[in-house]
């Protein structure tokens, strides 16, 4: 039963890119909708929990919210450039490599021979998976788009990795972070989406896009609960399975075109990224 609960974050987070893309809208509208949805959920959670706020908790959580918006906005741009089925495995892989290396360098997480061996195998699998999922059979069909997408996803990963490093480095409790983090998300989204488009940031579509924001925030709370039930290492590993839903869903539901060879490479690449993520979780608990 605990494992089933621990799979909820992967299920929720895996569907978010599909729902956002299906709902459409500009990157600005999607970013505002997501952050407003997350804030709405955070306010509701506030009344059903007993968070403890300190200046450090509020300040660091607010900054992580700003970093999340950077990560999310650039990831949304990548969806439009190279598609969900290609962007999600690459994005997940970059985040895994980034958080793992920061964990090793800053927090000395690989302190045994076994962890070092498992960690390097995991990184090799993830990097291999990224290369496979980014493969394009016909180079003229999107080499420039892929380069642009990779740069965009790298910036996105920096935002997400920075978030994780701050939360871990300052030992911020998940429940305590939710509301100030969501406030940081909305304020930074308002600033980042202020210019860069002619369409309205707030309309009916923006309201509709709060739904995936609520779903993401629910996955965040579920992750906090899952970590308490099965441990951080197992919870982290299981959360990586969301990329399978996003990738397969992008191909089937969003009808993103792939050649037979590209499809094979994407599937194998996703498997490698997931295995790498699981191995990192094993290394954390070893």
Swiss-Prot record:
Membrane topology: Multi-pass membrane protein
Membrane-spanning intervals of the chain: 4-26, 33-55, 114-136, 149-167, 177-194, 207-226, 230-252, 264-283
Superkingdom field: Bacteria
Gene Ontology CC, one term: plasma membrane
Localization: Cell membrane
One Gene Ontology molecular-function label: carbohydrate transmembrane transporter activity
Keywords, in A-Z order: Cell membrane, Membrane, Sugar transport, Transmembrane, Transmembrane helix, Transport
Family membership: Belongs to the GRP transporter (TC 2.A.7.5) family.
Name recorded for this polypeptide: Putative sugar uptake protein lmo0176
């Amino acid at each position: 039963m605990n494992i089933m609960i621990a799979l909820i974050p992967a299920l929720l987070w895996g569907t978010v890119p599909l729902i956002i893309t299906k709902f459409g809208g500009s990157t600005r509208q999607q970013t505002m909708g997501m952050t407003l949805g997350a804030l709405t959920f955070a306010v509701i959670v506030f009344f059903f929990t007993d968070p403890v706020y300190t200046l450090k908790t509020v300040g660091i959580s607010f900054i992580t919210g700003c970093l999340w918006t950077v990560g999310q906005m650039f990831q949304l741009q990548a969806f439009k450039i190279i598609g969900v089925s290609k962007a999600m495995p690459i994005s997940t892989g970059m985040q895994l490599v980034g958080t793992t290396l920061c964990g090793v360098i800053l927090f000395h997480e690989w302190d045994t021979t076994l962890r070092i061996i498992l960690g390097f195998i995991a990184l090799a699998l993830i990097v291999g998976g990224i290369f496979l999922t980014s493969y394009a059979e016909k180079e003229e069909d999107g080499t420039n788009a892929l380069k642009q997408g990779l740069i965009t996803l790298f910036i996105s990963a920096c935002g997400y990795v920075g978030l994780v490093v701050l939360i871990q480095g300052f030992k911020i409790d998940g429940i305590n972070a939710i509301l100030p983090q969501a406030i940081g998300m909305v304020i930074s989204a308002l600033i980042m989406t202020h210019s860069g488009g002619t369409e309205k940031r707030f309309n009916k579509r923006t309201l509709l896009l709060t739904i995936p924001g609520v779903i993401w925030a629910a996955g965040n709370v579920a992750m906090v609960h899952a970590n308490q039930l099965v441990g951080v290492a197992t919870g982290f590993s299981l959360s990586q399975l969301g990329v399978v839903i996003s990738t397969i869903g992008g191909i089937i539901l969003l009808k993103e075109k792939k050649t037979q060879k590209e499809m094979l490479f994407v599937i194998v690449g996703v498997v490698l990224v997931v295995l790498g993520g699981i191995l990192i979780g094993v290394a954390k608990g070893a």
